[in-house]
Amino acid sequence: MIRIVAAFVLLSGLWLPGLQSALSAESCTRPSLEQTADLYLQALKRGAPSLLPLAPGATYIENRKATPFGEGIWGSPLEVDFSRSLLDVDICETFTEIISAKTDHPYVIGTRLKVVDGAIAEVESLVSDRDDWLFDADSYLKYSSTEKWDILPPETRSDRQTLIRVASDYFDIFEDYAAFDRVPWGIPCVRIEGGAYTNPKNEPNPSCTAGVPKGGGVPMTNRRYIVDELLGAVMGQVDFGGPKGLPDAHTFRLEDGKLRYVHVITLCPDGCPVIPPPEDMPRP
């Protein structure tokens, strides 16, 4: 219907405010975003950004720094052991978790793609390695690859605003523990944090409240979200500790309105803070 209206408007020499954004929204579909995310992965595996469908003036940001395509993680082909993508048709962006564990230089990567009119306008990656928070790519691969993140039945999904609110409430806990009770904790629920895992003994009814901070006045600022309602998932990208804090991405999945999975990638560009493990964090 939008295309019919657009054709009429163009033929009549008129242009309606907001029509361009409506057309862009119509052209941004789940299959097109999935294809773009797949093209990104194929290009990364070959170390060939030239294979990306880039928009004119497209930018690449790696670990919060503007980086030329072809440098950084693009410097050589990347062996990808596992990946998972969130597709947000509302804002035409994707987020892909990428695990490269079986190499001499392992990585866990979180990449955001911004798509405009079918082309990639922005690529932003958080590339974590051995010097980053609780990093263990083998552990991350072991646990993430066995989780079930399939499309949820409609009756078990949460809407966009609910998913964002849950992520926001979770982030609020770091500054004020009063937010803890606002989070819909589920059982079972597990968290992968860098590679640390909250259910190493494979208990039948684990909780991902283990190791959650008890409120330490730590702000989580510059919050940006990518939402995939069909997966019940939301990724929140933040500055851990306030402006110029640690680059961080938390990914959440809700099932039946309850938290089921939490994944965390946190970079330590100037070295990780020395923090003793929480007393309630399970040990292997």
Per-range role (PLM):
Residues L23-P284:
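C-terminal and inter-domain tail/linker signature
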